[in-house]
């Protein structure tokens, strides 16, 4: 990250992120805006946009969970410790579509369906502006934690090709459990593994072309081939059925590192194009389009040979089921801006679509016995969004303020759609009531899960900004939105900045915001079938509109609401720039995924209402209130020397704390089914503590960039504070101690066209603390999914860039 003044990011008509004043730089706004340049992204040494931002921004975290179904492939990121879908993502100041995946497993971001930033190739990016402040009154739903605005390259000439190759060179030590009495295999107590895996090749290219004279067409391509990593544990459990009361001899020779717990296998192709063309008379045409094809593979838990979920005739040694999602992502935008009297006008249409379809491999449907297929089409889901936007900006010389009053007005119409496609029948059906139904690890979506719904949202806004005096900047915005499914919302924002001197200012804002319930949260459905006494019972993730969900207490979802306060200081101390921003975010009615309500009392209650064969399930619900407070600090210090080159030092820090102040209660009808004191929670201990302590409360980073002639280097240290992996009881909680990761890269310019780089991410090969054996029952997962930096170890890489 670099100072906004040095980034020199050219702001398009309508202003930069957080302001609609066309010539307002990010350093002069009343709200905190960071700028991450394309050079910073490239020098980060990583191949994912989310991961690059996590090392550049103080309050941005990108955990990398494993064994989490589709979340292994589309991983959520968080800003200021809030949910992934509470940060709005824009491309060239236009709303980006979300992914179709809603995270339903036990990871950070459970219940959220967020934008997948990794659908945008780094080669297409000129800079990324990050507004660390709520902005619902300016941009609409989702902008509670902040706004990420990706600025695309606008080049009519030149180009670049970058090829990088890297791999994991690592070693980790983990405890093991105890083998059963009389076992013919050993449990060493502790084991160290030396690994070399995760080979990743990335090719990124962009080319600028002239378009009809004075226009530009910038094309970008990225291809990524990533091999999996395996950071599994030692599975000390019995694997085979007993033979005449004795352990099978194969127990002594089977590979007990039998999981793929780590980074997924990924093959990904991304194309991006951005264009602009002057039309004359102050008008111009612009637009962009993108396409991504991502094929990934990750694994579930190992099914042992003796498991009831296995069929010995198919897998005599057990099997590792593979989840192989196919993700397709498309977007296109076209717009025109023109001058209408004193108004700078803009109109655009933006379309986005994301689809995720599941193939389940190396698995079986145990209820079909030896005739079961081993590969299944399990169905999937998709999400689409079309946004029409028209806006106008002008300046009025009121004679009252120290500057003209900037007035911005606009209207936005957004159409969203969401659908679920059923899998093939063998992926979900049951052929034997004594066996589990469906494809192991991920049963297919059933016909009863199929949905195809849509909604329309209409919003209007007005935004004012002016220098009230020579030293006082003020802005105000108000936005009204109406949704066809849940109702309307009104958001407002006030922001002030007072420059005491040319080198010191205070800034602050107050606002209310909202996030509309996403379509996946309203309509996602999935079914697994369990047999109780030979009778099939469905355990479902219900859409809130399902009558069975209503019987369990579900109600139509409403918007999440927030009140944000921020107060900050901006100082220029000679060459050193300093920003300190404190924030407080009070959220009401956060949308969460409930606990699974599958107790026998629930099943009996549902049967009494006529819902036969349903043993309960879970659903999305409003009702969690939280308070989040924190401080962001950013220090930039450029140093020019005569003989030692240039040094750019950046220090960033974030302290963040969230408290859950209210959880939704179980319905009165269900509460009455349980004895006093034994009522199950609707939102339980694990989920509450995930909100409060699942993210580190503090994160600090020091970054040094050095350049001298043809040579350059980056040295970065990032300190992640403690995080908690919560258990169902305090005795099963596990605290991840703070860790410091060091990254190092060296660069050399062979000539004006060719640059080579060598580097290491996580140079010292740090890992999160390993679970004790008592908390790792299967032995497969020695590390927590709550680790803020993953658990892949050291990554060594080389990179060659050719400019033309």
What are the functions of these language-model segments?
Residues 49-52, 56, 75-77, 115-118, ...:
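N-terminal periplasmic accessory domains that precede
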Residues 99, 587, 657-658, 717-726, ...:
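C-terminal beta-signal and adjacent terminal beta-strands/loops
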Residues 13-44, 71, 100-110:
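N-terminal periplasmic "start-of-domain" segments of outer-membrane beta-barrel proteins
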Residues 313-315, 319-333, 351, 363-473, ...:
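Outer-membrane beta-barrel transmembrane domain signature of Gram-negative proteins
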Residues 22-23, 54-100, 142, 146:
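Extracytoplasmic beta-strand/coil segments of soluble accessory domains associated
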Residues 409, 577, 582-727:
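Gram-negative outer-membrane beta-barrel transporters
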């Amino acid at each position: 990250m670099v100072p906004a003044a040095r980034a020199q990011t050219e702001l398009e008509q309508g202003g930069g992120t957080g302001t609609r004043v066309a010539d307002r730089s990010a350093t002069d706004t009343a709200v905190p805006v960071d700028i991450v340049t394309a050079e910073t992204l490239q020098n980060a040494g990583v191949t994912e946009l989310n991961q690059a931002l996590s090392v550049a921004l103080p309050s941005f975290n990108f955990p990398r969970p494993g064994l989490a179904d589709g979340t292994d492939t589309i991983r959520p990121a968080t800003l200021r410790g809030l949910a992934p879908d509470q940060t709005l993502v824009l491309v060239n100041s236009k709303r980006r579509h979300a992914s179709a995946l809603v995270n339903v497993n036990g990871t950070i971001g459970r219940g959220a369906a967020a934008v997948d930033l990794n659908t945008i190739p780094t080669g297409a990016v000129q800079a990324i502006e990050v507004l660390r402040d709520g902005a619902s009154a300016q941009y609409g739903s989702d902008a509670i934690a902040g706004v990420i605005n990706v600025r695309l390259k606008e080049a009519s000439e030149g180009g670049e090709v970058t090829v990088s190759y890297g791999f994991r060179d690592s070693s980790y030590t983990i405890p093991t459990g105890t083998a059963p009495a009389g076992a013919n295999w050993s449990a060493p107590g502790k084991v160290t593994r030396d690994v070399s895996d995760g080979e990743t090749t990335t090719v990124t290219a962009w080319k600028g072309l002239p378009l009809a004279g004075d226009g530009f067409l910038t094309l970008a391509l990225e291809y990524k081939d990533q091999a999996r990593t395996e950071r599994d544990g030692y599975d000390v459990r019995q694997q085979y059925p007993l033979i005449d009361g004795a352990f099978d001899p194969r127990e002594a020779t089977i590979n007990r590192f039998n999981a793929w717990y780590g980074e997924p296998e990924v093959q990904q192709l991304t194309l991006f194009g951005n264009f602009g063309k002057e039309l004359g008379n102050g008008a111009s045409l612009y637009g962009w389009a993108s396409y991504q094809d991502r094929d990934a593979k990750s694994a579930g838990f190992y099914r042992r040979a003796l498991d009831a979920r296995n069929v010995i005739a198919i897998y005599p040694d057990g099997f590792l089921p593979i989840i192989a999602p196919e993700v397709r992502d498309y977007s296109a935008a076209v717009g025109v801006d023109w001058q209408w009297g004193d108004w700078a006008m803009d109109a655009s249409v933006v379309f986005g679509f994301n689809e995720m379809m599941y193939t389940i491999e190396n698995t079986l449907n145990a209820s079909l016995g030896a005739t079961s297929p081993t590969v299944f089409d399990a169905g999937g889901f998709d999400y689409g969004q079309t946004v029409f936007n028209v806006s106008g900006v002008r300046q009025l010389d009121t004679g009252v303020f120290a500057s003209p009053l900037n007035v911005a007005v606009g209207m936005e119409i957004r159409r969203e759609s969401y659908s679920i496609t059923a899998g093939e029948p063998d992926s979900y059906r049951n052929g034997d009531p004594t066996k589990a139904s469906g494809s192991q690890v991920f049963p297919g979506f059933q016909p009863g899960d199929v949905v195809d719904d849509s909604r329309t949202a209409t919003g209007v806004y007005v935004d004012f900004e002016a220098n009230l005096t020579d030293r006082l900047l003020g802005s105000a915005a108000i936005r009204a939105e109406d949704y066809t499914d849940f109702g309307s919302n009104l958001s407002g924002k006030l922001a002030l900045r007072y420059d005491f001197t040319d080198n010191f200012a205070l800034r602050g804002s107050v606002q209310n915001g909202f996030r509309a319930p996403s379509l996946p949260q309203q309509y996602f459905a999935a079914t697994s079938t369990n047999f109780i006494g030979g009778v099939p019972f469905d355990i479902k993730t219900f859409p809130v509109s399902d009558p069975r969900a209503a019987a369990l207490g579900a109600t139509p979802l409403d918007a999440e609401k927030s009140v944000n306060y921020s107060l900050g200081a901006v100082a220029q101390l000679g060459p050193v720039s300093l920003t300190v921003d404190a924030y407080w975010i009070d959220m009401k009615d956060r949308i969460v995924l409930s606990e699974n309500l599958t107790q026998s009392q629930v099943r009996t209650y549902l049967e009494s209402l006529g819902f036969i064969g349903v043993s309960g399930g879970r659903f999305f619900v409003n009702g969690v209130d939280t308070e989040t407070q924190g401080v962001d600090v950013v220090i930039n210090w450029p140093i020019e020397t005569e003989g030692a080159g240039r040094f750019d030092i950046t220090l960033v820090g974030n302290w963040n704390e969230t408290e859950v102040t209210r959880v939704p209660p179980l319905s009165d009808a269900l509460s009455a089914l349980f004895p006093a004191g034994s009522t199950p929670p609707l939102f339980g201990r694990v989920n509450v503590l995930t909100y409060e302590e699942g993210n580190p409360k503090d994160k600090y980073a020091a970054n040094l960039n050095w350049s001298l002639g043809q040579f350059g280097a980056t040295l970065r240290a990032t300190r992640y504070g403690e995080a908690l992996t919560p258990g169902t009881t305090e005795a099963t909680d596990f605290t991840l101690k703070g860790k410091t990761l060091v990254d190092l890269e060296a660069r050399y310019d062979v000539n004006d066209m060719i640059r080579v780089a060598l580097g290491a991410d996580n140079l010292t090969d740090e890992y999160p603390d390993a679970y004790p054996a008592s908390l790792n029952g299967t032995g497969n997962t020695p590390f927590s999914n709550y680790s803020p930096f993953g658990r892949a170890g050291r990554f060594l890489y080389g990179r060659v860039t050719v400019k033309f």
